[in-house]
C-alpha cells in the first residue's frame, strides 16, 4: 500500500500496527496506513487498494502450501482447540498439499500453515467490498459511484448471512431435541459476520465524525444542515458498546444450557437490531460511501479492470462462512 501510494504521489503514512491481543487468536488485525487528501483517479485508487492484498497472497499461498504439507494428522478423540474454517481456496490447497486422513482424524496445522491461514483470514476481511477497506477501494475503482449505491445492500447481506446461519443451526438442533445443549456453540460459530456488520457501521460512524470535524475546522462559518439532517442517528459509541456486550456475554455463557441465561442475550440482540431498524444501519445511510476521486468519471483501462475483477474474485475464494468460534 505504502509503495503504491508513494508511486502515485498520494500523501500516506507508514503502516500502523493494529494489535488485538484478546479478540484475535493472532494478536493482531494487521496494519493500516493513513492517506490524506483525495486520490487522483480510479486507476491510482485501484493500485493502492489492490497492491496490499495481492502482495500478501503472493506470500501467504505458498507458505500455506508448504506449511500444510508439513502438518500432522492427529486423532480427534478428546481433542480441544479452535477448529479453523475452510474457504474454497483453502479446500483446493488442502486437496493439493495436505496429508490424507481418515474418519476420526484431523490435521494439526504447523506453525507456518497457521500463520499463513491467519494471513489469508485477514486478507479476506480486508477484501470485503465495502467502505474504505481494500475491497472497497477496488470495488469503487471498478464501479465508481454505482458501488456506493449498492454498498448498504452488500453490507446487509452480512447480517442476513448471520441470521440464516444461526436460525438454521437452532432449528436443526431443536428438531433433534438438543437446542439448549448446543446454543452456545451455535452462537459462537455464527457470530463473526454479525460482529463485522456492526464493526463496519462503527468504523463508518467514526470516520464520518472525523470528516465533519475537518470540514468545521476548514469552514467554521459553513452551513451544517446536511450534518444536522443525517438519517443515521445511532451513535458509533453506543453501537460499539452494545456489540462488545453481546460478544462478551456469549463468550461467558457459552457452556450454559439454561434458557434463563440465553434469553437475555437474544433479547439484547433483538434490541440492538430494533435500534438499527429504527435509526441505524437498516435505514438508508451513507456510512459506507467511498470518497470520490478527483477524476471520478475517468474509467479504468482494460488491464486494470482485469486486476480489479481478479482481486474481488479472491474475496469469493477466501470467504469463510464460519471462520472460527468467537
Question: Residue ranges of each PLM-predicted region?
Answer:
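Hydrophobic transmembrane alpha-helices and their immediate loop junctions
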Residues: 1-326
Amino acid at each position: 500500500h505504502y509503495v503504491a501510494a508513494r508511486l502515485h504521489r498520494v500523501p500516506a503514512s507508514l503502516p500502523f500496527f493494529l494489535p488485538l491481543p484478546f479478540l484475535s487468536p493472532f494478536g493482531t488485525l494487521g496494519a493500516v496506513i493513513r492517506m490524506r487528501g483525495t486520490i487522483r483517479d480510479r486507476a491510482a485508487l485501484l493500485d493502492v487498494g489492490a497492491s496490499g492484498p495481492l502482495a500478501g497472497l503472493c506470500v501467504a499461498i505458498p507458505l500455506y502450501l508448504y506449511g500444510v504439507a508439513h502438518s500432522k494428522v492427529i486423532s480427534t478423540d478428546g481433542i480441544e482447540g479452535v477448529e479453523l474454517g475452510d474457504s474454497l481456496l483453502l479446500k483446493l490447497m488442502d486437496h493439493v498439499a495436505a496429508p490424507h486422513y481418515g474418519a476420526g482424524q484431523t490435521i494439526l496445522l504447523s506453525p507456518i500453515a497457521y500463520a499463513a491461514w491467519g494471513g489469508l483470514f485477514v486478507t479476506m476481511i480486508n477484501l470485503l467490498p465495502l467502505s474504505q477497506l481494500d475491497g472497497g477501494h477496488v470495488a469503487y475503482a471498478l464501479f465508481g459511484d454505482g458501488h456506493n449505491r449498492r454498498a448498504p445492500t452488500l453490507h446487509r447481506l452480512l447480517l442476513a448471512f448471520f441470521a440464516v446461519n444461526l436460525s438454521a443451526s437452532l432449528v436443526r438442533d431443536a428438531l433433534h431435541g438438543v437446542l439448549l445443549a448446543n446454543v452456545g456453540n451455535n452462537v459462537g460459530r455464527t457470530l463473526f459476520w454479525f460482529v463485522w456488520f456492526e464493526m463496519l457501521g462503527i468504523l463508518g460512524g467514526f470516520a464520518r465524525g472525523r470528516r465533519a470535524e475537518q470540514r468545521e475546522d476548514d469552514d467554521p462559518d459553513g452551513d451544517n444542515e446536511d450534518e444536522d439532517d443525517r438519517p443515521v442517528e445511532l451513535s458509533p459509541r453506543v453501537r460499539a458498546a452494545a456489540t462488545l456486550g453481546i460478544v462478551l456475554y456469549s463468550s461467558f455463557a457459552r457452556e450454559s444450557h439454561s434458557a434463563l441465561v440465553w434469553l437475555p442475550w437474544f433479547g439484547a440482540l433483538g434490541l440492538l437490531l430494533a435500534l438499527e431498524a429504527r435509526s441505524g444501519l437498516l435505514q438508508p445511510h451513507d456510512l459506507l460511501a467511498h470518497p470520490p476521486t478527483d477524476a471520478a468519471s475517468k474509467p479504468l483501462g482494460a488491464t486494470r479492470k482485469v486486476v480489479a475483477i481478479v482481486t474481488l474474485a479472491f474475496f469469493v475464494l477466501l470467504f469463510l462462512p464460519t471462520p472460527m468460534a468467537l
